[in-house]
């Protein structure tokens, strides 16, 4: 969310007409050497009176600090006192206090680029920079986390990044969130991380939910690593889907016809289409540079999205569930999401996954996507950072489900004991062992991964809305999507 700062005209005792555009802002504090300071997810800025722009003071991750629950004060000598929280899913927040002063850092720099780094990624970089004696990760973001960004600004940022890469200015480490992993992989820009894992004496694949690595893999190579994952899926009551192992779009359509237009929770036509575009790779062959958005299968998907679009215009909204909901789309971040729905369906809960033709279709949503540049001259150092994502200690601080089995067991046991940071989701505060087992089965059975390509998604949704509004038929919209998507894909090859 973006913010503006308004000041008070003390003569008129009214708001000043001039306002300062702050952009995404996580905190605002008065200063000594500056009139005030503000910070976003990555940088602290200082502002002089009347200035429209602040000057960067320091980067949080450079200092080894996260931006969760930050309190800040400036001393008269220019030093800063910072109190910052450190997260762990099994306990309440703990705090660290740091006194920051200017100094030299002689460690070797590892460059890292992100379009918009999540708080979890910033924390991972901060933790590494706080503890590693040899290397320091220097994180550059195009946009702070949660800043409002137009499609044009986003596309221009991707063009700028790709231009830098073409000119040889490739960072050592890439945050692949919001970038097309398939395109970067097909161009040979990303290291295969399987050999790094195999030669690391402290990492054993069997300690993890290995299906996560398999889902991420492309052509037998591992383009990035994550530390945690959520599961995108659909669920319903046992009586509604008895005998089904997964479902097709046609079967999901019957739910709407049988139980009413507003019977699927957390789903609109546009969101359904976006979810399927991110998870169903059958419409694009990146190796051949071809797509099939004019196929009967995609037209049917578009028609179903239109039916949901009509129903969602009069839906219940918010996150509260009504007795009218026969099914729901859910992103399972913790065991408490399972607990909540199990109670709603009186224990008769079935996870069928997203609609597809091959049985249960559960999708992994990685918490982070961190890859190593194939052209980096500091691959050893880059791996020093990337490997920290796999450590049990680090994964205890993830906000999603850890993919390390021991970390998973510890955070889910905390949920059973009522000591998880996620207790606010479920008012009773405790999950059951059955909830834990179902969560584990769900994570262990997910065989697909969510892939982002915001430019392509925006293009497709723009044309889909023409169908939703009645301006075009589903077939006409699909043909226009096919034409524009083909052009975009050819430009990327």
Regions found by a protein language model. Name each.
Residues 140-208, 327, 343:
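Extracytoplasmic "Venus flytrap"/periplasmic binding protein-like
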Residues 21-33, 65-75:
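Repeated scaffold domains used in trafficking and secretory/extracellular systems
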Residues 234-240, 363-378, 397-400, 404:
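A bilobed periplasmic-binding-protein/Venus flytrap-type ligand-binding module shared by bacterial periplasmic
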Residues 48, 303-384, 409, 413:
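Extracytoplasmic/periplasmic substrate-binding proteins
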Residues 178-233, 348-355:
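Hinge/lid segment of periplasmic solute-binding proteins
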Residues 197, 214-316, 374-380, 472-476:
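Helix-loop-helix "hinge/cap" segment bordering the ligand-binding cleft or interdomain interface
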């Amino acid at each position: 969310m973006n913010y503006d700062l308004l000041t008070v005209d003390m003569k008129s005792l009214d708001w000043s007409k001039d306002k300062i555009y702050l952009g995404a802002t996580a905190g605002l504090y008065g200063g000594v050497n500056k009139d005030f300071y503000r910070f976003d997810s990555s940088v602290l800025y200082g502002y002089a009176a009347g200035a429209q722009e602040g000057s960067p003071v320091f980067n949080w991750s450079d200092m080894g600090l996260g931006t969760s629950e930050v309190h800040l004060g400036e001393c008269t000598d220019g030093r800063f006192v910072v109190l910052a929280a450190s997260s762990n899913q099994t306990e309440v927040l703990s705090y660290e206090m740091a006194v920051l002063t200017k100094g030299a850092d002689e460690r070797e720099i590892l460059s890292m680029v992100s379009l918009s780094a999540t708080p979890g990624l910033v924390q991972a970089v901060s933790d590494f920079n706080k503890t590693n004696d040899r290397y320091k990760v220097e994180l550059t973001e195009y946009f702070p986390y949660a800043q409002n960004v137009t499609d044009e600004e986003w596309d221009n940022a991707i063009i700028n990044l790709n231009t830098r890469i073409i000119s040889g200015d490739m960072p050592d480490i890439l945050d692949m969130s919001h970038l097309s992993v398939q395109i970067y992989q097909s161009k040979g820009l990303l290291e295969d991380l399987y050999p790094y894992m195999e030669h690391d004496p402290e990492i054993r694949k069997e300690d993890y939910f290995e299906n996560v690595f398999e889902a991420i893999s492309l052509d037998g190579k591992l383009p990035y690593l994550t530390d945690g994952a959520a599961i995108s899926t659909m669920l319903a009551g046992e009586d509604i889907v008895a005998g089904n192992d997964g479902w097709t779009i046609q079967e999901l359509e019957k739910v709407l016809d049988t139980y009413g237009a507003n019977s699927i929770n957390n789903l609109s036509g546009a969101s359904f289409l976006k979810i399927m575009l991110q998870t169903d790779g059958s419409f694009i062959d990146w190796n051949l540079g071809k797509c099939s958005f004019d196929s009967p299968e995609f037209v049917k998907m578009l028609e179903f999205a239109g039916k949901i679009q009509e129903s969602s215009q009069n839906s219940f909204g918010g996150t509260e569930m009504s007795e009218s909901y026969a099914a729901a789309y859910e992103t399972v971040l913790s065991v408490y999401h399972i607990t909540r729905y199990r109670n709603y369906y009186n224990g008769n809960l079935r996870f069928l996954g997203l609609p597809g033709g091959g049985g249960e279709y559960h999708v992994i949503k990685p918490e982070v996507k961190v890859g190593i540049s194939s052209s980096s001259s500091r691959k050893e150092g880059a791996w020093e950072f990337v490997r920290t994502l796999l450590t049990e200690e680090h994964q205890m601080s993830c906000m999603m489900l850890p993919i390390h089995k021991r970390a998973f067991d510890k955070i889910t046991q905390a949920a059973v004991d009522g000591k998880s940071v996620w207790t606010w989701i479920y008012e009773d505060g405790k999950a059951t062992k059955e909830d834990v087992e179902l969560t584990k089965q769900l994570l262990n059975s997910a065989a697909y991964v969510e892939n982002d390509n915001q430019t392509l998604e925006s293009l497709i949704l723009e044309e889909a809305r023409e169908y939703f509004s009645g301006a075009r038929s589903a077939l006409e919209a699909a043909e226009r999507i096919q034409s524009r998507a083909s052009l975009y894909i050819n430009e990327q090859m």
